[in-house]
Amino acid sequence: ADPPIHIASL
């Protein structure tokens, strides 16, 4: 399970 990182953070 990946941490809830926002797509904009990528």
UniProtKB/Swiss-Prot annotation:
Catalytic activity, as annotated: (R)-amygdalin + H2O = (R)-prunasin + D-glucose
Enzyme class (EC, first level): hydrolase
GO molecular function: amygdalin beta-glucosidase activity
EC number(s) stated in the UniProt entry for this protein: 3.2.1.117
UniProt modification remark: Glycosylated.
Domain of life: Eukaryota
Keywords for the protein's UniProt record, in alphabetical order: Glycoprotein, Glycosidase, Hydrolase
Quaternary data: Monomer.
Protein name per the record: Amygdalin beta-glucosidase 2
